[in-house]
Each structure stands twice: as structure tokens, then as C-alpha cells.
């Protein structure tokens, strides 16, 4: 697939308008105007992403559309759909016509690939293996609580009520579960010990919300739980919005959470406007876009931008990658498919 060579040099603000498509939506468009190719037909793109990326994309998209308009004269409209990564993946496979997907884990993109909608090799179509953001798992506690939660083992304390999303619908929750499991198996424990520990932690969860954003609402707005397991970026964003609860980044063990992006080939080939879609994906890796990801809580993949935010994103020494779990294809089958480890843990503790 040919990629467009497109230079990016400045940013201006675009106009946001609310639209509707599915899950949680907005529409972003450029204003009509003159450009090098003003007669070029307008393009409409649908971005399908996971819940906690919304704040970042709603800042990035207007900058892209204005720069694209200035460079090419083409008006671009974005429709945006946000929800749990697993739910969003199923929606695309079931017919939601996405041009671009930005999901919580590569296995979700691989499911769309397996459905024949994305061509093999999508990982090589963008920089950094098409991983556009990184994050880690954070523990959020409450200043009013006397319960101490500083490391993974503390989550098994019967007095601790844990808020984490459901791995069946949330990509973030799958990362959380791998964190729970890996905190035992990657630090010298056995799988039997990990199974027992995971059961204790999930037994301490009063609810399993559908996605990371809903987990945040359950914890902050509904007041449930003593500790919230969530993306570091979601915690930092909540802090920016006034929810200033204490949090820690577990240092005894953590997981590097990688967010992939891909073009949905069947959609863009049908519409015949691959150039602008490819350009948008490439734009996500520019310093301008990476700066916005960093400002909205994500660890940028651009090293220069990451260096600027070093104090905000402390290095984690014992940091595992998905490859240490055998890659997402193996991890998905082993942990989260029907009858996998998560289902077995839920069955053991008698939870539906």
C-alpha cells in the first residue's frame, strides 16, 4: 500500500460539532475554504476507538483537518465512536464501517484482520509497529480511606474493594488482569498461586464496569471501592478535571500498555480515499500529536516528546511487555477466550 508523503509544520484549531454514530460520538469537520485543490471532493472518516482516548483525539483531529485543508484544499469530516475496546471491535466486525481503528490492544485489531477487514501486515504500515501510545497500570486510592494499598499483594486484602473493568468488554481490563496474574508469575510465583491470587482480587470487586471510563465514574462519581485499577492516562486525565485522589504506579511489577492504530482496508478501498486516511495515521506519530497524547495522560512513543514529560511519567523498572505473555494471540486464547483463565477464576469464586 502506498503511503502519502505529507509535511506537517503548524497547527490551527478546527470546529467541533456533535454528531451521532454509535457508542459515544462526535463529528469534527473543517470549514469550507480555498486551498491548492479546492475542488477536491470532501472526505468523511470514521474513527472507532476505545473510551479513554476521546479527550486526546478531540484535540488532535481539528489540528489535522485544518492542516490537511491548508495543504490540499480538501475538507475532511470525522465521525468518532468511543467505547470499550472489545465492544468496539465487535461492532466493527459486525458492520460498523470504520476507516481507522485505535484500540486498547493489538489482539482487537487482529480480530478485525481475521474478519478480512484489515490486510495482514498492518503493523508495518505506520511507525513504531503501529503502536501510537503507551501507558501503565495505576492504583488510585482515596485520601479519606485508612486502607493502605501500595503493591499488588494488597489487592487480596478482604477489606479492600477493587474497581476494575470487565475483560470481556474492556481492553484496559485485560491489561489489568495480566497485571494481576503477572505480579505473581513474573516475580517468582507459580500459576497455581496466580490463580488463587486472581480469585481473591476479583472476589473483592463489587462490580465489573464495561470499560475504563465507566470504571472511573464508578469510583469517583458513585464512590464505590477503595482502589481503582486503571490506565495511568485515565488517572492523569481525571486529575486534570479536578478528581485529585492519590495514586501510585506499582513498581514491584507493571505492564507496558501499548495502543495500536490501523486503517480498515475494506472501508478505505471502497471509498477510494486512502490518502487522507493514511495521512491521518501518520500524523498521529508527529511531535504535535504526540504532545497532545502526552498532555492527556498517555506516555508518548516519540522519544523527544517523552523526554519533555519525564517528570510526569516516571520510569518503571520491573515492566513487562505483552511478548512476555506470549503475544496477544496467545494471551487472548489463554486468558480471555471462552473457557480461559479469566472464566475459570470467575467460576471458582462463584461469580456470574
Curated annotation (Swiss-Prot):
Keywords: Periplasm, Signal, Stress response, Sulfate transport, Transport. Its main location: periplasm. GO terms for molecular function: molecular carrier activity; molybdate ion binding; sulfur compound binding. Induction: By sulfur deprivation. It comes from the Bacteria. It is found in: Periplasm. GO terms for cellular component: periplasmic space. GO terms for biological process: molybdate ion transport; sulfate transmembrane transport. Residues 1-40 form the signal peptide. Belongs to the prokaryotic sulfate-binding protein family. PANTHER family: SULFATE-BINDING PROTEIN. This protein specifically binds sulfate and is involved in its transmembrane transport. This is Sulfate-binding protein. It comes from Synechocystis sp. (strain ATCC 27184 / PCC 6803 / Kazusa). The gene is sbpA.
